[in-house]
Amino acid sequence: HTDAEEVTLEVNPVKVIMRVDTLYLVAGEMDEKGNQAFKNYVFERIDSVTETNHAMPKFVFDAKLHYKYCFGKYSGQGTPEDVSLEIKSSSKWLQSQFERSHFYPEISKRFDKNKNMIVDMKLHVTPDFLNWLMGNAGEVRILKPASLKESVKKLLKKALAEMDA
Protein backbone atom coordinates (compact mmCIF):
# COMPACT_ATOMS: atom_id res chain seq x y z
CA HIS A 1 0.00 0.00 0.00
CA THR A 2 1.53 3.29 -1.03
CA ASP A 3 -0.29 5.25 1.68
CA ALA A 4 0.83 2.93 4.49
CA GLU A 5 3.06 4.23 7.23
CA GLU A 6 6.70 3.27 6.78
CA VAL A 7 7.93 0.90 9.49
CA THR A 8 11.42 -0.41 10.21
CA LEU A 9 11.57 -3.94 11.60
CA GLU A 10 14.40 -6.20 12.64
CA VAL A 11 13.52 -9.74 11.58
CA ASN A 12 15.21 -13.14 11.50
CA PRO A 13 14.93 -14.35 7.88
CA VAL A 14 14.31 -18.08 7.66
CA LYS A 15 13.03 -18.88 4.16
CA VAL A 16 11.72 -17.39 0.93
CA ILE A 17 8.46 -18.95 -0.29
CA MET A 18 6.30 -18.45 -3.38
CA ARG A 19 2.63 -18.97 -2.52
CA VAL A 20 -0.37 -18.14 -4.70
CA ASP A 21 1.83 -16.12 -7.08
CA THR A 22 3.26 -13.98 -4.27
CA LEU A 23 6.83 -14.07 -2.96
CA TYR A 24 7.22 -14.01 0.83
CA LEU A 25 10.09 -13.67 3.25
CA VAL A 26 9.32 -15.95 6.20
CA ALA A 27 10.89 -14.59 9.38
CA GLY A 28 11.17 -16.28 12.76
CA GLU A 29 10.73 -14.81 16.20
CA MET A 30 10.44 -16.09 19.73
CA ASP A 31 7.09 -15.48 21.40
CA GLU A 32 6.66 -14.52 25.06
CA LYS A 33 6.68 -18.22 26.07
CA GLY A 34 9.93 -18.94 24.23
CA ASN A 35 8.23 -20.77 21.35
CA GLN A 36 9.23 -20.23 17.75
CA ALA A 37 6.70 -18.30 15.67
CA PHE A 38 6.86 -17.34 12.00
CA LYS A 39 5.48 -14.37 10.06
CA ASN A 40 5.20 -13.77 6.33
CA TYR A 41 6.40 -10.51 4.77
CA VAL A 42 5.44 -9.74 1.17
CA PHE A 43 8.61 -9.04 -0.81
CA GLU A 44 7.08 -6.25 -2.90
CA ARG A 45 6.41 -4.28 0.31
CA ILE A 46 10.03 -4.51 1.51
CA ASP A 47 11.82 -1.29 0.54
CA SER A 48 15.29 -2.07 1.86
CA VAL A 49 17.30 -4.66 3.76
CA THR A 50 20.20 -4.03 6.13
CA GLU A 51 22.42 -6.74 7.56
CA THR A 52 23.15 -6.51 11.30
CA ASN A 53 25.66 -8.18 13.62
CA HIS A 54 22.87 -9.35 15.94
CA ALA A 55 22.84 -13.02 16.88
CA MET A 56 19.93 -15.00 15.49
CA PRO A 57 18.44 -18.07 17.15
CA LYS A 58 18.37 -21.31 15.17
CA PHE A 59 14.85 -21.67 13.82
CA VAL A 60 13.30 -24.96 12.74
CA PHE A 61 10.88 -24.09 9.95
CA ASP A 62 8.52 -26.56 8.27
CA ALA A 63 6.52 -25.00 5.43
CA LYS A 64 3.96 -27.80 5.53
CA LEU A 65 3.21 -27.10 9.19
CA HIS A 66 3.35 -23.32 8.68
CA TYR A 67 0.58 -23.50 6.08
CA LYS A 68 -1.40 -26.26 7.79
CA TYR A 69 -5.13 -25.47 7.83
CA CYS A 70 -4.65 -22.60 5.38
CA PHE A 71 -6.69 -21.41 2.44
CA GLY A 72 -4.94 -19.04 0.06
CA LYS A 73 -1.99 -16.83 0.88
CA TYR A 74 -2.26 -16.33 4.60
CA SER A 75 -0.81 -18.56 7.27
CA GLY A 76 -3.37 -18.87 10.02
CA GLN A 77 -3.39 -17.56 13.54
CA GLY A 78 -5.20 -19.13 16.46
CA THR A 79 -7.20 -22.33 16.39
CA PRO A 80 -8.40 -23.73 13.06
CA GLU A 81 -12.16 -24.21 12.66
CA ASP A 82 -14.24 -27.12 11.39
CA VAL A 83 -15.91 -25.82 8.22
CA SER A 84 -18.54 -27.55 6.08
CA LEU A 85 -19.61 -26.18 2.71
CA GLU A 86 -22.17 -27.26 0.15
CA ILE A 87 -21.03 -26.70 -3.43
CA LYS A 88 -24.13 -26.64 -5.64
CA SER A 89 -24.57 -29.38 -8.25
CA SER A 90 -25.02 -26.68 -10.91
CA SER A 91 -21.47 -25.48 -10.22
CA LYS A 92 -19.43 -28.28 -11.81
CA TRP A 93 -16.46 -25.96 -12.37
CA LEU A 94 -16.26 -25.19 -8.65
CA GLN A 95 -16.69 -28.84 -7.70
CA SER A 96 -13.81 -29.69 -10.04
CA GLN A 97 -11.65 -27.09 -8.27
CA PHE A 98 -12.12 -28.95 -5.00
CA GLU A 99 -11.44 -32.27 -6.74
CA ARG A 100 -8.08 -30.98 -8.01
CA SER A 101 -7.00 -28.84 -5.05
CA HIS A 102 -4.53 -29.97 -2.42
CA PHE A 103 -5.25 -29.22 1.22
CA TYR A 104 -3.23 -30.07 4.29
CA PRO A 105 -4.70 -31.80 6.12
CA GLU A 106 -6.82 -33.48 3.46
CA ILE A 107 -10.41 -32.35 3.09
CA SER A 108 -13.36 -34.71 3.01
CA LYS A 109 -15.62 -34.60 -0.06
CA ARG A 110 -18.91 -36.41 -0.57
CA PHE A 111 -22.11 -35.91 -2.56
CA ASP A 112 -25.64 -35.64 -1.24
CA LYS A 113 -28.70 -37.09 -3.00
CA ASN A 114 -29.02 -33.91 -5.13
CA LYS A 115 -25.39 -34.19 -6.35
CA ASN A 116 -24.29 -31.20 -4.30
CA MET A 117 -20.71 -31.64 -3.11
CA ILE A 118 -20.32 -31.47 0.66
CA VAL A 119 -16.82 -30.40 1.68
CA ASP A 120 -15.62 -30.79 5.26
CA MET A 121 -12.32 -29.18 6.22
CA LYS A 122 -10.39 -27.81 9.13
CA LEU A 123 -8.79 -24.45 8.42
CA HIS A 124 -8.03 -20.97 9.63
CA VAL A 125 -10.64 -18.44 8.55
CA THR A 126 -8.45 -15.89 6.78
CA PRO A 127 -9.19 -12.80 4.65
CA ASP A 128 -8.57 -14.94 1.53
CA PHE A 129 -11.15 -17.49 2.61
CA LEU A 130 -13.77 -14.87 3.54
CA ASN A 131 -13.29 -13.09 0.19
CA TRP A 132 -13.50 -16.39 -1.66
CA LEU A 133 -16.78 -17.22 0.10
CA MET A 134 -18.18 -13.77 -0.75
CA GLY A 135 -17.16 -14.12 -4.39
CA ASN A 136 -18.78 -17.55 -4.66
CA ALA A 137 -21.83 -16.86 -2.47
CA GLY A 138 -24.21 -17.92 -5.25
CA GLU A 139 -22.52 -21.30 -5.65
CA VAL A 140 -21.61 -22.16 -2.05
CA ARG A 141 -23.72 -22.59 1.06
CA ILE A 142 -22.00 -22.48 4.45
CA LEU A 143 -23.24 -25.39 6.54
CA LYS A 144 -21.00 -24.77 9.56
CA PRO A 145 -19.92 -23.01 11.66
CA ALA A 146 -22.86 -20.64 12.12
CA SER A 147 -20.44 -17.87 13.12
CA LEU A 148 -18.75 -18.06 9.69
CA LYS A 149 -22.12 -17.88 7.94
CA GLU A 150 -23.03 -14.77 9.97
CA SER A 151 -19.65 -13.13 9.25
CA VAL A 152 -20.05 -13.62 5.50
CA LYS A 153 -23.65 -12.34 5.59
CA LYS A 154 -22.47 -9.16 7.38
CA LEU A 155 -19.67 -8.66 4.84
CA LEU A 156 -22.08 -9.12 1.92
CA LYS A 157 -24.58 -6.66 3.43
CA LYS A 158 -21.78 -4.13 3.98
CA ALA A 159 -20.60 -4.57 0.38
CA LEU A 160 -24.12 -4.04 -0.96
CA ALA A 161 -24.55 -0.93 1.18
CA GLU A 162 -21.25 0.45 -0.15
CA MET A 163 -22.46 -0.05 -3.72
CA ASP A 164 -25.56 2.03 -3.00
CA ALA A 165 -23.69 4.78 -1.14
What are these regions (language model features)?
Residues 1-84:
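Core beta-strand-centered patch of the WYL/Sm-like small regulatory domain
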Residues 68-165:
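Polybasic (Lys/Arg-rich)
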